Every structure is written in C-alpha cells, then in structure tokens.
C-alpha cells in the first residue's frame, strides 16, 4: 500500500489479498463473496462488464460478467479481474497511454498496463489510474449511458464524472477495494489575519430542570458569536462533555473564514445526581446518558436544553437539523451520533472522535444497525486512534473501524481518520477539517445515501414514505386482493376499511364485530377474526357478512390457496400458550401450540412454508404445510431486531412479496428477512412509530403499506404483492 495510507488500510490490504484468493475457487458456493460492482458515476444504472475480451458497460443485472475482483499487488497498485475468469486482468490495450486507448482483458502478465491505482475521492467515488500512465484514468467515453458504450483511457481532470467510478462490495466484505487510497486529509486551513477574527461572548449556567434525567445537575456554557444579530435563526453547534476554551477560538476562526455559518455553541456536560450526604460518590450519569442508544439524550437536547437556552438568553436558534452540528469524543462521540441517528431532523452533522461503539449499553450493535436500517440524512466525520482504549466493553480501535466500514457499506457521506496517538487523540487538531467537511455546501441539505446493497433491491431512489391516510382509532391486520385493493381492520372503531386503487380510503364494513385481522381468499372473499366476538366471518364484495364459525377468538387470520384458513389464538388466560388453528369446511383443527403470543402469519410464494410471528419475542417461526393443512418441522427460524430499550420485537403482522422476501411489522419498523432467516433490511416510518400492520398492494402490487395506529404510510418498492389468489411461484435464494 501507499506509504501515506493509514495503518488499517495497509493491514486490510494484505488480508484482502489472501481472502480474495481463497474464495475465487469457491465461487459456486458464494458467487458474490469478495466481488465488486464497478459503475460509472456518469451513467446511473450501468456497470462495467466484460464482453468477451472487450470491456464496456451494460445495464446492471447481477450477471457474472459484471462482477470484479480487486486484488492488491505491488505497493499502491492492484489488479482487476472479471469474476467469471480471474485468469484475465483489466488492461490498457497494448500498454497505450494516449487519450482513447481502449480497455481490454488480457492474460495475466503483471505488466504496468495491468496494474491500477484506485484513488478515493472526497465524494466517495474513485479514479482508476493505470500504472504506466498516471496522468490518465479509466473513462466512460463522453459519459455514455447505453449498453456497449466505449470505455477507454483519458486525461484525468478533477470533477469530470466520466472519469469517476462507484466501486461497491457485492457481499461478504464492506471495506474499500484493497488497494484504494483514502482521500486522506487534503484540508488546507483558510488563512486569515488575527485582527479579522471577531471575539464572541461566553455565558454559563447550571441546568437542573430535566424531566428525562430527573434530579440531575449539569454545567452548560453558551458561546454567542460577534456576528450574531438575531435577525434570522442561527445555526447550532452542540458539544457534549462540556466547554474547552480552544473550541471558542476555533468557532470564532471558522465563522470569520465563512467555513461555518454564524453558529451559536452550546457546550453541555453530562448530568450527575448529587448524594444526600457529603463525603460519598454521586450517581454519575455520563454512561447512562451518553452510552445508552435510546433517544433519551437527543430528546433532552431538543425538548429541554435548547429551548431553555433560547428562552433564557433570548436567542433565535434554528430548529432545523440541517443547521445543527453535534460533536463529542469517546462516549460523547457515540451520543453525538446516536442523537443524529434517532432525530436527523434535529442534528444532521456529526463529529465523533474515538466514538464508544462498544458494549457499555448496546453501542456495539451500531455497525450492524447502520448496515440494516435504511440510510438516514447524516454527514459524519469520525476518528480513531492507533493506541485507542480497550477494556471489558471492547476495543475502540477495531469497533471505530467497524463503524467506518458500515457507513461506507450503506453509502453515507462521511470521512474517517486514524490518528497516531491514544484515546480521542487529534480531536482539536482535526476540528477545523471536520467542520469544513461537515458544513461544506451549507445551506444545501444533507442527503441520505443509497443504503446497503440488499436495501437497494427493495427501495426505489427518490421514492420515500408518503402519508396515505390518518385519523383512525386503530389500524390492524391488512390484506390485499388480486386487484391490489388493500383492506384493514379499525378494531377500536368496529369497522373494516378499503384502500382503493386510487389510494382513497372508504368504509367497507360498518359493524365488523371488532374484527382484529382480515384476509382474502383465492376467490376474493374477505374473512375476519376477532379477539372479542368469537366469530369468524366472511364478507362478499358488497360487504355483506356471514358467520363461518362461532366460538373462536383469534388475533390473526390467513387464507390459503386451497380453501383453508389459519387462525392464531392466544386465549383469555395470562401466559397461556398460543395456538394455531386450521379451519376448513367449518371445522377447526389445532395444528400447533407453544408460542408465547402468536400474531401475524404469511405463506411463502411457493406455498409450502408457513411463517407465524411471536409478538412477545424476537422470533418468527417457520413450518412445513402438509397436504391436509396440518403443520410439521417447526423451527424458530427468523430472528428480528429488538431495540435496546424494548423487550421484544413486537411483530404484529407479516407478509411475503412475490419475489420471496418476508416483511414483518415491528416496533422498529418494517423488517425484511432473507429466505434463510436473517433480517437484512429495516425500514422505519417517518415518525418512527411502531408498525402494527404491513401489506403490499396497489394497482401494480408494488406499493408497500405500513399501518401505524392512527396513520397509514405508503411507498413504491421493487417488490410485488402475493396472496391466496397467486399461482405457485418459485422462490430463489436471497443474496447474502
């Protein structure tokens, strides 16, 4: 690796070479492990592909000729191999070094024209530079956007998107390509004369009024810049762990150079609960407030501290997260990121030095959460130290690098620095660089990245959540019919509603017997079950009801393609085991018991596996469906994410997509599982409320609905509805 690269990149390069070499021979078992997609920044949706010995671009399809191995070779250079035939290497034809030299695949020789330097840019893209022509780069000629477009060498020019490439790990790895150069610190402080730096004012007070952390007291310092006049909302810089004079000078300098907008600083220490008698230890709240991964601290900042500061000091503070930055080191670093994570609308810019992503209070799970949750509009500048802290909670140096890799994996706009030193080394030294990066382009809004690869298979760029309807007393147990109409129960209001193909909600049944869930069979007939009435009802297309079975209370109901119904029931005795029933021809048969609290159900598109959610655990169970409707081969199969402050995932409703993905409505949002069990994607709704129902529907079957108490959210996705009306459909294995 290049001598100027941070140590972790030098080490990871060696391990990547070994790893990639080993997995090449096992391609049939894990086709994407270690492989990358190389896509032109100038042609979204296109990727580099091998067409015989020729190299061109094609529409992304996941084909083998669009997958590449990137393997470190000599110093800062690497070789790029097509995954379908690693004996060939990407090369400049004939060793050419002129504009227009075509790119080809050649038998490996180690020639300079086969060695490439991958230089990472500030925007996350890469220049691919051949060893024999360092002034040239891999070029999407004229920004071609059609399959078969010419790929050649061209003179490198900063900002030319034709020469920029997105290099994305497909599976198994999330680190940068092994020979990629970090952009590193190219920040040059803006020079300014000392007399041009205007000095701001400092105010100090103790805050003792917290309801989130009752009884605590804490020191707070306010910095008011000389440029502040109150005529418009000022930006906010919130610093955890209190005030240091150096940051006042840094703020004054950055505001004077206009690298930061006019910004009011709020420096707050963690709270402590004083003991009733002197001579003993107080209750130190720092770990509780800072290392906890709930939203308590950000709510304290947003609902208590900042309004108090604005009110008591007559300050016009912006409430927009795009105008706010939050900063800290160690536990103060993780709480800064946690604040932005829970409320990016309150803080969208984060500086965290030696962040404590360790197992104090669940912070060690953050790298995984960043990979699974849909990316959020957060820009971050993170650092770690070569001799960082290590204790029973974990190794800061390793876990900080895990956060680095996770943020890259999910496409976040961020920078990461490894600093020579100990815990929180370089915080002040990197402060100006961090602020320049975090505030670049302001007031342009910080945008969310593209999310992780598996999420990109579900969501559609630019198609976020929209409020579909609101004002209900409850929304439960949704289902769609073959046309794409979606039905759901408002149990509290004793109604069943329909979302028609125009997206409008109308009343379908005025008196539903407190139906708790609906389902629709292959013929379009709607069925309901109730936890109160004890009646299993059917309704025709006009909403006329008929009692199918009396004496059965149930949580959820599901129609099969074979004229049968499954019902989950939890009885009326506390802690009694739940039951799954199969109903056919008016008769009920107990087919399973033992779950803590059985809730939603779904049948896979190939119609032989039934999923049943346990709402009082983190599990969804899987069963084989026998021909007579009985169940066999029960496994606690799908683990769901449980937030640190929750006791269970709270799965209420589940459904499948035609493509074979399982969607679960949970406390954390909609969790989407791979066919073999793991949760790969989590889609929270905009107000972060619990999702109690999930369904795919709409005229094309590609609208995802999330039911959340009194609201319903919707968004277009790359998945499609399936139900009892659907034919048997083959399910393919989900990528890792």
Give names to the regions the model predicted:
Residues 491, 531, 570-572, 615, ...:
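Short loop/turn segments immediately following the C-termini of beta-strands
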Residues 448-464, 579:
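Blade/loop signatures of beta-propeller domains
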Residues 695-736:
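Blade-level signature of beta-propeller repeat domains, shared across WD40, Kelch, NHL, RCC1
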Residues 176-447:
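Non-catalytic cap/lid and distal C-terminal segments of serine-dependent acyl enzymes
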Residues 470-485, 511-530, 534-535, 551-579, ...:
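Beta-rich, blade/repeat-based domains predominating
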Residues 30-175:
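Lectin-like carbohydrate-binding module/patch detector with strong preference for beta-trefoil
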Residues 94, 623-630, 717-723:
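Short loop/turn segments immediately following beta-strands, especially the blade-tip
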Residues 464-469, 504-509, 544-549, 587-593, ...:
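A short beta-strand motif characteristic of beta-propeller blades
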């Amino acid at each position: 690796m290049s001598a100027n690269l941070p140590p972790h990149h030098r080490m990871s390069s060696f391990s990547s070479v070994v790893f990639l070499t080993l997995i090449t021979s096992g391609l049939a078992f894990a086709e994407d492990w270690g492989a990358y997609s190389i896509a032109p920044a100038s042609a979204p949706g296109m990727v580099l592909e091998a067409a015989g010995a020729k190299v061109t671009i094609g529409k992304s399809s996941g084909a083998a000729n669009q997958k590449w191995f990137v393997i470190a070779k000599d110093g800062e250079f690497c070789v790029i191999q097509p995954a379908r035939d690693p004996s060939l290497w990407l090369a400049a034809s004939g060793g050419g070094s002129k504009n227009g030299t075509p790119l080809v695949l050649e038998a490996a020789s180690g020639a300079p024209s086969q060695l490439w330097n991958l230089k990472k840019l500030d925007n996350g893209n890469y220049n691919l530079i051949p060893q024999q022509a360092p002034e040239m780069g891999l070029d999407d000629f004229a920004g071609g956007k059609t399959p078969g477009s010419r790929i050649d060498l061209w003179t490198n020019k900063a900002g030319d998107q034709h020469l920029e490439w997105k290099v994305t790990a497909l599976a198994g790895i999330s680190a940068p390509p092994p020979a990629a150069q970090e952009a590193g610190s190219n920040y040059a402080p803006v020079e300014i004369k000392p007399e041009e730096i205007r000095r701001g004012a400092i105010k100090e007070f103790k805050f003792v009024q917290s309801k989130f952390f009752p009884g605590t007291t804490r020191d707070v310092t306010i910095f008011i810049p000389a440029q502040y006049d109150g005529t418009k909302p000022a930006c906010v810089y919130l610093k955890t762990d209190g005030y240091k004079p150096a940051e006042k000078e840094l703020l004054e300098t950055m505001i004077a150079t206009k690298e930061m907008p006019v910004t009011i600083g709020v420096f707050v220490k963690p709270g402590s609960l004083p003991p009733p008698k002197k001579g003993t230890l107080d209750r130190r709240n720092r770990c509780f407030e800072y290392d906890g991964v709930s939203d308590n601290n950000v709510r304290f900042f947003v609902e208590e501290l900042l309004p108090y500061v604005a009110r008591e000091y007559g300050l016009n503070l912006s409430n927009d997260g795009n105008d706010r930055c939050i900063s800290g080191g160690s536990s103060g670093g993780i709480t800064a990121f946690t604040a932005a994570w829970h409320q990016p609308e309150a803080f969208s810019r984060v500086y965290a030095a030696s962040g404590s992503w360790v197992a104090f209070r669940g912070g060690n799970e953050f790298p995984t959460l960043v990979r699974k949750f849909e990316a959020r509009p957060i820009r971050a500048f993170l650092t770690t130290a070569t001799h960082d802290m290590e204790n029973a909670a974990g190794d800061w140096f390793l876990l900080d690098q895990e956060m680095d890799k996770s943020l890259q994996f999910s496409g976040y706009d961020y920078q990461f620095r490894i600093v020579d030193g100990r815990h929180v080394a370089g915080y002040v030294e990197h402060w100006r660089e961090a602020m320049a990066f975090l505030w670049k382009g302001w007031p342009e809004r910080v945008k969310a990245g593209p999310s992780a690869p598996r999420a990109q298979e579900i969501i559609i760029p630019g198609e976020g959540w929209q409020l579909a309807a609101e004002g209900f007393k409850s929304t439960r147990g949704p289902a769609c019919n073959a046309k794409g109409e979606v039905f759901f129960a408002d149990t509290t209001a004793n109604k069943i509603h329909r979302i028609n193909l125009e997206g409008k909600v109308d009343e379908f049944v005025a008196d539903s017997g407190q139906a708790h869930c609906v389902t629709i069979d292959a013929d379009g007939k709607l069925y309901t079950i109730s936890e109160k009435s004890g009646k299993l009802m059917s309704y025709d297309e006009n909403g006329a009801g008929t009692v199918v079975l009396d004496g059965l209370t149930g949580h959820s109901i599901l129609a099969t393609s074979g004229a049968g119904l499954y019902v989950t029931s939890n009885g009326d005795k506390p802690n009694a085991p739940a039951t799954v029933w199969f109903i056919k021809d008016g008769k009920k048969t107990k087919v399973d018991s033992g779950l803590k609290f059985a809730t939603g159900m779904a049948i896979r598109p190939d119609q032989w596996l039934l999923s049943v959610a346990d709402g009082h655990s983190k599990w969804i169970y899987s069963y084989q469906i026998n021909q007579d409707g009985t169940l066999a081969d029960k496994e606690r199969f799908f683990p769901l994410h449980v937030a640190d402050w929750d006791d269970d995932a709270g799965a209420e409703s589940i459904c499948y997509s035609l493509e074979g993905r399982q969607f679960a409505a949970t406390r954390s949002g909609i969790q989407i599982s791979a066919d073999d069990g793991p949760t790969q994607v989590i889609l929270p709704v905009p107000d972060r409320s619990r999702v109690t129902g999930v369904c795919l529907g709409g005229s094309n079957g590609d609208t995802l609905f999330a039911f959340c108490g009194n609201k319903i959210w919707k968004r277009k996705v790359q998945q499609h509805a399936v139900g009892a009306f659907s034919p048997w459909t083959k399910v393919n294995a989900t990528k890792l």
